[in-house]
Amino acid sequence: MTGGGKSGGKASGSKNAQSRSSKAGLAFPVGRVHRLLRKGNYAQRVGAGAPVYLAAVLEYLAAEILELAGNAARDNKKTRIIPRHLQLAIRNDEELNKLLGHVTIAQGGVLPNIHQNLLPKKTGKTGKTLSQEL
């Protein structure tokens, strides 16, 4: 008998295990997304590329929202992103607002907005212009 060591039958020169996330260059977990797609009964079978693509899309959306929220936090002279910054980031971006239009963010507040009819009228003109208008 030969080679009864711990290597078990692996060929010499085998590589270390590498996750599908690292193969795809992603931070989001491809294996977890694949498991959730299988368990969610979305389809009978799930292809090998679908969880990689979905994880990449989720990672892109998260990065986009966090970048805009970080800008909102910096505008408010804060170093920590809070739900208010997420709300401002999403509602001020046209595409994200369309995507997440019906989403409620807890502790997010509302966008500052004063209707034009409620603002005071500008009166910087003299009486001459008033007589000309009539």
Swiss-Prot record:
Enumerate the CDD domains for this protein: HFD_H2A (cd00074)
Disordered: region residues: 1-25
Q: Where is the composition biased (Gly residues)?
A: 1-11
Residue span of motif [ST]-Q motif: 131-132
Indicate the annotated site residue(s) for Not ubiquitinated.
Answer: 121
Q: Which residues carry this modification: N6-acetyllysine?
A: 6, 10
Q: Which residues, renumbered to this chain, carry the PTM N5-methylglutamine?
A: 107
**Localization per record:** Nucleus; Chromosome
Indicate the principal place this protein occupies in or around the cell. nucleus
User: Which GO-annotated molecular functions does the record name?
Assistant: DNA binding; protein heterodimerization activity; structural constituent of chromatin
Report the GO terms under cellular component: nucleosome; nucleus
One GO BP annotation of this record: DNA repair
Phosphoserine modifications at: 131
Q: Sorted alphabetically, which keywords does the UniProt record give?
A: Acetylation, Chromosome, DNA damage, DNA repair, DNA-binding, Methylation, Nucleosome core, Nucleus, Phosphoprotein
Q: What post-translational modification information does the record give?
A: Phosphorylated to form H2AS128ph (gamma-H2A) in response to DNA double-strand breaks (DSBs) generated by exogenous genotoxic agents and by stalled replication forks. Phosphorylation is dependent on the DNA damage checkpoint kinases MEC1/ATR and TEL1/ATM, spreads on either side of a detected DSB site and may mark the surrounding chromatin for recruitment of proteins required for DNA damage signaling and repair. Gamma-H2A is removed from the DNA prior to the strand invasion-primer extension step of the repair process and subsequently dephosphorylated. Acetylated by ESA1 to form H2AK4ac and H2AK7ac.
Q: Does the record's keyword annotation contain Cell membrane?
A: no
Q: Which Pfam families match?
A: Histone, Histone_H2A_C
* Cysteine disulfide partners in this protein: none
DNA repair keyword on record? yes
What does the UniProt entry state concerning the protein's domains? The [ST]-Q motif constitutes a recognition sequence for kinases from the PI3/PI4-kinase family.
Q: What does the function comment of this entry state?
A: Core component of nucleosome which plays a central role in DNA double strand break (DSB) repair. Nucleosomes wrap and compact DNA into chromatin, limiting DNA accessibility to the cellular machineries which require DNA as a template. Histones thereby play a central role in transcription regulation, DNA repair, DNA replication and chromosomal stability. DNA accessibility is regulated via a complex set of post-translational modifications of histones, also called histone code, and nucleosome remodeling.
Q: How does it assemble?
A: The nucleosome is a histone octamer containing two molecules each of H2A, H2B, H3 and H4 assembled in one H3-H4 heterotetramer and two H2A-H2B heterodimers. The octamer wraps approximately 147 bp of DNA.
- Additional note from the record: In contrast to vertebrates and insects, its C-terminus is not monoubiquitinated.
What the record says about family reads: Belongs to the histone H2A family.
| Protein name, as recorded | Histone H2A
Give the taxonomic lineage as stored in the record: Eukaryota, Fungi, Dikarya, Ascomycota, Pezizomycotina
The UniProt gene name for this protein comes to HTA1
